[in-house]
Design a protein with these regions (language model features):
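N-terminal basic/disordered segments at the start of proteins
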Residues: 5-72, 157
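Cap/lid and interdomain-hinge subdomains that line or gate substrate/regulatory clefts
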Residues: 29-43, 53, 86-92, 96-115, ...
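Gly/Ser/Thr-rich loops at beta-strand to alpha-helix junctions
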Residues: 41, 45-49, 119-129, 156-158, ...
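N-terminal short beta-loop-beta anion/metal-coordinating cradle
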Residues: 50-80, 352-365, 431-450
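Short acidic, glycine/serine/threonine-rich loops at helix termini
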Residues: 51-54, 126-130, 160-168, 253-258, ...
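Conserved, well-ordered active-site substructure
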Residues: 55-59, 405-407, 415-464, 468
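Conserved, well-structured core segments that form the ligand-binding/active-site neighborhood
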Residues: 166-353
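C-terminal structural cap/anchor segments
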Residues: 350-414
């Protein structure tokens, strides 16, 4: 972030158009209870549950698991696809298979639903691919014509806002356009503009012009309310992109009520969003952050060490683990990524790490495992994805090698936390307990997992302040022992 650049004040900007209405969320919930409409969230990494609680996430999209996930009265189900870590072909295949299974199961169960494609609040991920595939497959398998897809990257818990069609990150008290942050330089999903209409044109390689998008502005929301937003939604057809400006839950609650009204009128929508809209449109109320006792296993593993595993290579993550290591006595094990990427040295390096981790955990020593911080890049996106996958699979091997159950498990990074969940811990069905801190969800593993009934802290790579990992660690240690 350049010191010479003049940015909008975060505080001053958020105070403009500031409104609240605590009754809106209850109205959303009442509507869903009456209509029984469900939202099925296809989550491209496991961090998308970072605003919700008391809901379930499945990591297996077979028909039996989808049926189990839709069998209760909850209005939302998450399906972890992990497509952000896959190439375009695999991403397309996964989305098609899931839609086919959803269509079959919901037809059998008599459920009306909408699909949310939940992705990154910093605009990374397979857009427009996933939306286009969902539209095409719904038309083929269910004869559903999508009127439009709402683009809603707002994620308030991590200070991500969309104002005048520009998507911002709140950083150091200022609003910074997302294209001026490290996330825009992502080796796989990089982009050049934070102006969402122009971003659509950029990501579609010009096939969708910037002026073809419908806009729901803050003025529409605050001055026109539900009726004005509803009017805009009714004008959508043939999968029109619809950009939603939002800087508070009031804005999203108004949009959610208008969307539900439009659905009742026969409109069909897809959604490309970050995490905040799910909390709103599913009518989920606030709850306090989880206590340390809710984050730590309530069994004999309390006598074992906790385990933190870090794969994310963002600057934010590097700052966070440095802060943790400087503040608290925790065993530190660095995985040498160069050795992991070399077939001749990979096994020796992983054997070393696995032995140390198991010794530490069984001896009640909290342990941090992290990848070496030098980012290794290839010449193209496909090779960069392969590097990420190789590193992540190595972290999975560390988890799978554990012989004793840690008292808590935290994974840092989207790809890391997904692979740890599905391949390391063998999670198929988990309950989302809530959040440890803003934007950091906690799962409770199911009976099928490697370690059942274990709190699993899913920490996104792009979330939190410098001391956020240390803050969670401190909260756990204080509640467990009364001291650090």
């Amino acid at each position: 972030m350049s010191n010479a650049t003049q940015y909008l004040s975060l505080k001053d900007t958020l105070e403009l158009f500031s409104k609240s209405d605590d009754s809106l969320r209850a109205k959303i919930k009442a509507h869903l209870n009456q209509t029984k409409h469900k939202f099925i969230v296809l989550d491209d990494d496991p961090t998308g549950v970072q605003t919700v609680h008391d809901i379930f996430v499945i990591t297996d999209w077979g028909k039996d698991w989808i049926k189990k996930g839709l069998s209760d009265e909850r209005s939302v189900l998450y399906i972890l696809t992990n497509t952000r870590s896959h190439n375009a072909d695999k991403t397309e295949n996964i989305n098609r298979e899931i839609v086919q299974n959803i269509v079959d199961v919901t037809k059998e169960m008599g459920i009306n639903y909408s699909i949310i494609s939940r992705s990154d609040s910093t605009l990374r991920g397979h857009y427009p691919l996933e939306i286009n595939v969902l539209q095409d497959e719904l038309l083929k398998t269910a004869d559903v014509e999508i009127s439009g897809h709402l683009i809603i990257p707002a994620f308030f818990e991590a200070h991500r806002y969309t104002i005048d069609n520009i998507h911002y990150l709140g950083m150091e008290g200022q609003l910074v356009p997302v294209n001026e942050t490290e996330f825009a330089n992502d080796s796989v999903f990089g982009f050049k503009t934070a102006n969402l209409p122009k971003w659509i044109e950029e990501k579609t390689n010009g096939s969708v012009a910037s002026d073809s998008a419908l806009i729901i502005s803050l003025e529409d929301i605050h001055d026109g309310g539900i009726d004005r937003v509803y009017e805009i939604l009714l004008s959508a057809n043939n999968n029109t992109p619809i950009i939603v400006n939002a800087k508070s839950y009031y804005d999203l609650d108004i949009v959610s009520l208008a969307v539900l009204k439009a659905i009742d009128s026969g409109k069909q929508f897809l959604f490309r969003t970050a995490a905040s809209i799910v909390k709103s449109i599913a009518g989920i109320q606030d709850r306090p952050y989880l206590s340390a006792n809710e984050i730590v296993s309530n069994d004999e593993s309390q006598n074992n060490g906790g385990f933190i595993i870090v794969g994310s290579h963002t600057n934010k993550t590097t700052e966070q683990i440095k802060e943790l290591m400087s503040k608290y006595p925790i065993e530190q094990i660095e995985i040498n990524v160069v050795k992991v990427l070399n077939k001749e040295t990979r096994m020796e390096e992983l054997t070393r790490v696995c032995q140390l981790v198991d010794q530490n955990i069984s001896s009640n020593r909290d342990t941090l495992v992290y990848t070496s911080r030098d980012l290794i890049c290839a010449k193209d996106k496909e090779e960069n994805l392969k590097i990420s996958q190789t590193v992540s699979s190595s972290l999975v091997k560390v988890i799978r090698s554990l012989k004793v159950k840690p008292k808590f498990i935290m994974a840092k990074g989207g790809i890391t936390s997904s692979d740890v969940a599905t391949d390391g811990l063998d999670i198929k069905y988990a309950k989302v307990l809530g959040q440890a801190i803003a934007g950091v969800p906690v799962w409770l593993t199911g009976s099928e997992a490697k370690f059942k009934d274990t709190p699993y802290i899913v920490f996104p790579g792009n979330v939190g302040d410098k001391d956020s990992i240390a803050q969670i660690f401190e909260n756990i240690k204080k509640d467990q022992k009364g001291e650090i």
